[in-house]
Amino acid sequence: MARPQTDIDAGRIALLEVVDDLVRRRGSVDISMTDLAAAAGMSPSNLYRFFDNKEALLEAVAERFFAEKIQIMVEVTESDLPVQDKMYQYFARRYLAMVAQYEAEPDLLKSYLEIGQQYFEVVRGYVDLGDHYLSLIVAEAMEQGYFEGLSIDEAVSLINQMVQCYTNPDALFYVGTIKLRVEKLATIVETIFLGLGKKSSAQKLGQTQIKIVS
């Protein structure tokens, strides 16, 4: 007899908590379905009622890891904030969510980041989703005359490089939260709109007074 979907969902949530416990104890060591079944006190065949295979398990882990950040991206892009505030909150709120994870359990976060590197194909879609929502903000800014002469992809690429320390969770470990303050991020976002503002163009950017090294 098939389990009701509510039971399946509850079982998956409980199993993801077991995954957390395994990662806390073992770090980023690869977790097999057999390991998870043993830790959960169930047979492997019963485990497959909740996750069809290891890929499905990894996808569920990634979905939970990124869930709050996706909610933030949706809320910010759908808000009525001025476009500069929208871009700031888009980065700042996700950064603060990462800081909360880091301060709560830094070792657990580090282990999950290492797992994400091992299975990047699983998390790639979430990385691309971040660019998608940023593109919506950039497009809105372009409608107001910002980033003139740049394509959406060009603007997104430049912006991502400028705020990289606030979007890369690894930076929390080698830069730290004391230096990575949201007040600095606000200044960076303001500078983005000033430097790539309404009078900016691809031609102007190509005529920089800085001598390019080769």
Regions found by a protein language model. Name each.
Residues 67-70, 97, 117-143, 153-157, ...:
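Amphipathic alpha-helical packing segments from all-alpha helical-bundle domains
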Residues 8-11, 152-159, 181, 185:
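Short amphipathic alpha-helix in the helical subdomain of ABC transporter nucleotide-binding domains
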